[in-house]
Amino acid sequence: TFITLHSDNLFISKQGYWSEISNIDIPDRQLLTNTLWKARSKISKLYNSIVPYVNDRRKFSIQKNHISIEFFTNYNVEITIEEKEFTFENWKDFPIYITGGWFEEYTYMQLKLLEDLGTIYDLRIGLEIGFKEKEKSNKPFRFDNLKNMFSDTYQELDITFTDGKKLYIVECKAGNIKSEYIMKLQNITKYFGGLKGQGILASCFPPSNKILKKKIFDSKNIKLVSGQYFNEELTNIF
């Protein structure tokens, strides 16, 4: 309700339930996610090599930084991380998962602990907002502005939840933080969450750039959780 209260001509086109994630119940998937968190520095160095395979799902084989990944034409996966071996069958979206989707799932898993405690509510992952144009009226519609802001006709929110009073929007970054990520999260949070909306920039690595740190610090509606103390920083928000 927080999203529809603060937005015009919007509808939820994808509910963002955990169970909607393809192959989410594959055995050992959560174990792999936790393992990737521990090896986040090493896996981040492989993203550029894997990204070309995300759209067409071609097979690939990569061995680097004590990580071995085999993705086959039948979508089976073999991955070894620091002597931990994992095998999966028919995981078509694995290239998306391994290039950053895993971090969204890791962040969700940490927040799920808070939801189970009753600290937060209505936790979603990958919720999508659709825009629909109303019939012509004298009041100008901001559809073009939205399209320019979000670069498409819909917006996917990595993770959303509420504490019962305001909407929280989490933007997850498995790689380095860039200035445009901060501006994007500020805009999305304000638009969908209103003046009380709170953005959380979740990152595997804390920003090293002083300007980026200052931009986040000066922001009134964004909090940063990152790096070694990620879980503690996330919990301390509440």
Regions found by a protein language model. Name each.
Residues T1-F238:
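Intrinsically disordered, low-complexity Ser/Thr/Pro/Gly-rich regulatory segments
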